[in-house]
């Protein structure tokens, strides 16, 4: 063996099977747009969502803002309160569906009438949770939608 001080190392120009090896990249967090007209509700929901591998990429205080931010950011999941000023969640979802036809939408509301659930489904909702179940069921609903499943709890 030669003198280590005199040896040089040059990277090989021959490709090897290890050249393409890359460790598994961490899975990307779910980017969520959250719309509710009550700031305290948004703060609470953001806190809950951030405990998962979920990034709240935007918040909206009404349906009109939700439509604008959805168009701008193309989130992975949209969570909408049904009842908001300016433009409600149902109407916002109808507009969002025009340019994001496949993004999962999760609605929540104080009301859980069969008619409201049917309307939510008709505009393409993949999930619905009543507000009185949000603390217990929101993360379960988000996980279901992340896995391309539906979640209706009422």
Label every model-predicted segment:
Residues 73-79:
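Active-site beta3 strand of CheY-like receiver
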Residues 62-65, 87-91:
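Acidic catalytic/metal-coordinating carboxylates
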Residues 81, 109:
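Active-site residues of response regulator receiver
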Residues 68, 90-101:
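Short amphipathic alpha-helix used as the core "switch/output" element in two-component signaling
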Residues 84:
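Receiver (REC) domain active-site loop signature in two-component systems and cognate sites
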Residues 39-58:
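Two-component/phosphorelay signaling modules centered on CheY-like receiver
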Residues 1-31, 139-147, 152-154:
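Non-catalytic signal-transmission and effector/linker regions of two-component phosphorelay proteins
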């Amino acid at each position: 063996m030669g003198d280590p001080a005199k040896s040089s190392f040059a990277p090989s120009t021959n490709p090897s099977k290890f050249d393409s090896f890359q460790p598994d990249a961490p899975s990307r967090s779910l980017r969520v747009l959250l719309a509710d007209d009550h700031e305290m509700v948004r703060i609470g929901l953001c806190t809950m969502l951030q405990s998962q591998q979920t990034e709240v990429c935007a918040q909206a205080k009404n349906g009109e803002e939700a439509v604008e931010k959805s168009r701008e950011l193309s989130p992975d999941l949209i969570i909408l309160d049904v009842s908001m000023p300016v433009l409600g969640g149902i109407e916002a979802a109808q507009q969002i569906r025009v340019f994001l036809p496949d993004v999962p939408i999760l609605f929540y509301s104080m009301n859980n009438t069969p008619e409201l659930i049917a309307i939510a489904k008709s505009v393409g909702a993949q999930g619905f949770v009543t507000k009185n179940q949000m603390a217990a069921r929101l993360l379960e609903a988000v996980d279901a939608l992340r896995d391309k499943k539906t979640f209706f709890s009422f």
